[in-house]
A protein has these predicted regions:
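Solvent-exposed interhelical
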Residues: 68-127
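Short alpha-helical packing/oligomerization segments
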Residues: 118-143
Length: 185
């Protein structure tokens, strides 16, 4: 099948980027997270393509949600485990700079993620759509995540980073469920 071959090709590229580019960059630059966000966002997209046998704005939107989600997720983790990453020889953001600049970057990526996450309500994302109820739930979840990030910005401590990190996991799981079950409301 042509679509299976295409999915396999994308998967091979994902594995290549992760193993041959992202992993070697980890001890070199904290910017490796940007490269790693690409293969990290591909599975979300591939799930759509595998289920529908089509590629378009829908999987692209899912890719972008997952792409932007990874930054607050991994930067909160990096904030919590900075010493461990240093011991392992990895340069992860915040790279010892648990400062307002890092917290501001987290906030900005969350804002972009919120915008992209509610975009399916616009009707411009093809079969990936949200009802007003689904959009409100996704928006509330995004605002809650933003509040955790603002708390990190204000307190600048590991506990705030931990709470943000845990909420990022809850957020991603929740919005995926909203996208699925919103169709039945």
């Amino acid at each position: 099948h042509k679509s299976s071959r295409g999915l396999g090709d994308v998967y091979k590229r994902q594995v290549f980027i992760y193993t041959c580019i992202y992993t070697p960059l980890k001890p070199i630059t904290p910017l490796s997270v940007f490269v790693g966000a690409i293969p990290g966002a591909i599975p979300f997209m591939l799930g759509w393509v595998a289920a529908t046998n089509s590629f378009g704005i829908e999987p692209g939107t899912l890719f972008m949600i997952q792409f932007f989600w990874q930054f607050p997720h991994f930067w909160a983790l990096g904030w919590m485990l900075d010493d461990d990453y240093k011991k392992a020889g990895f340069n992860m953001l915040p790279t010892g700079k648990k400062d307002k600049k890092t917290a501001t970057q987290i906030i900005l990526y969350i804002i972009w993620m919120i915008i992209i996450s509610i975009f399916p309500y616009s009707g411009l994302t093809g079969a990936l759509s949200l009802s007003i109820y689904g959009a409100i739930i996704v928006l509330i979840l995004g605002i809650l995540m933003l509040m955790f990030a603002v708390n990190l910005y204000n307190r600048m401590n590991t506990e705030s980073a931990r709470r943000l990190f845990l909420f990022t996991i809850f957020y991603l799981t929740s919005i995926q469920l909203v996208y699925i079950f919103d169709k039945f409301i």
